Amino acid sequence: MALLEIYQYPAAVLLKKALQVETIDDTVIKLVNDMGETMFEAPGVGLAAPQVGQSRRIIVYNPQAGSSNANEDTKEFKALINPEIIASSGSIVSENEACLSVPDYSCNVKRFETVTVRGLNLEGKKLEFDAQGLLAVIMQHEIDHLDGILYIDRISTLKRNMYKKKVRKGLTNH
């Protein structure tokens, strides 16, 4: 396994819809394993393929994130290929949502409390499950990445423009 570069806003790959995975082959499996290692090293609770420069509909996530079962020593992750949210309910505000591709910034984002997610596992088996709480937030956040949507696209225009101004200023200072 290898650590991958995490692309940061405003990288073009983050701003466009990722391509469906047609075949789960050794290249996809290697990418998933590298993404899992990169996610834990960052550290994060989820990572989408566009965040590592790959326009593919793949996410990895820590299923224990926010759980009382979470063990810092266990680097277990799960992968979803071509995931989609097929139902949602409830409404919560995720507190201090952050993103590895949007450094040094966190904010509240309105997210659904429960989502039903459908996708494939690495063996190509169809999965469908309900995610609640933090896992629901992770699913919405990572699947947004696959659609070219960053969490800063889901906040007020004022806050988003302030962040973009900060990024532009940082880019011109280098």
Swiss-Prot record:
Reaction equation(s) it catalyzes: N-terminal N-formyl-L-methionyl-[peptide] + H2O = N-terminal L-methionyl-[peptide] + formate
Names of the cofactor(s): Fe(2+)
GO molecular function, one term: peptide deformylase activity
InterPro entries for the chain: Peptide_deformylase (IPR023635), Peptide_deformylase_sf (IPR036821)
Gene Ontology biological process terms in this record: co-translational protein modification; translation
Cofactor note: Binds 1 Fe(2+) ion.
Keywords recorded for this protein, A-Z: Hydrolase, Iron, Metal-binding, Protein biosynthesis
Binding site for Fe cation: 99, 141, 145
Catalytic residues in the record: 142
Gene3D superfamilies xref list: Peptide deformylase
N-terminal signal peptide: none
UniProt EC number: 3.5.1.88
PANTHER family for this protein: PEPTIDE DEFORMYLASE
Family according to the record: Belongs to the polypeptide deformylase family.
Function of the protein: Removes the formyl group from the N-terminal Met of newly synthesized proteins. Requires at least a dipeptide for an efficient rate of reaction. N-terminal L-methionine is a prerequisite for activity but the enzyme has broad specificity at other positions.
NCBIfam families xrefs: pept_deformyl, PRK00150.1-3
Protein name: Peptide deformylase
